[in-house]
């Protein structure tokens, strides 16, 4: 285990904050606003929620190697979010999006801030931030070696 630089520690904490905010945001929309998550939303939650624990433990232990699964989960989450966003906003994908097996079709748009920011967009940005910051930590640690 390599000791993290102060910059890497701060980035790791920032990743944890981002994952926590994404978790809190998704719970706000489902529990406070009563928006029922669709099937693709559940997949994104399955990929995001553990990141709070993974990066939290990594930050406490100051060991980025513990968080390696988070890199893969955030990358996969970014792909799922991108697909979900396309299902909501691109006509070719919208026809497919209604085929979600849950009680809520995946092409339902609960929020649409500024005409393009939907829940999958916000999730995708969160996954992207986590993924990029994790790569920056790995790069920072590589420089230190």
From Swiss-Prot:
It is a multi-pass membrane protein. Pfam families: DsbB (PF02600). GO terms for cellular component: plasma membrane. Keywords: Cell membrane, Chaperone, Disulfide bond, Electron transport, Membrane, Oxidoreductase, Redox-active center, Transmembrane, Transmembrane helix, Transport. Belongs to the DsbB family. BdbC subfamily. HAMAP family: BdbC (MF_00287). This is Probable disulfide formation protein. It comes from Oceanobacillus iheyensis (strain DSM 14371 / CIP 107618 / JCM 11309 / KCTC 3954 / HTE831). The gene is bdbC.
């Amino acid at each position: 285990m390599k000791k993290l630089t102060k910059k890497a520690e701060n980035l790791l904490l920032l990743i944890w904050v981002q994952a926590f905010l994404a978790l809190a945001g998704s719970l706000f929309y489902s529990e406070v606003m009563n928006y029922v998550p669709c099937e693709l939303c559940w997949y994104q939650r399955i990929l995001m929620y553990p990141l709070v624990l993974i990066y939290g433990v990594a930050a406490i232990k100051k060991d980025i190697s513990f968080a390696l699964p988070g890199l893969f989960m955030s990358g996969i989450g970014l792909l799922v979010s991108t697909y979900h966003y396309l299902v909501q906003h691109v006509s070719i994908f919208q026809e497919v999006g209604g085929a979600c097996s849950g009680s809520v079709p995946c092409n339902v748009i609960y929020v649409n801030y500024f005409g393009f920011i939907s829940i999958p967009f916000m999730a995708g940005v969160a996954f992207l931030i986590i993924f990029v910051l994790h790569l920056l930590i790995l790069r920072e640690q590589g420089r230190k070696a």
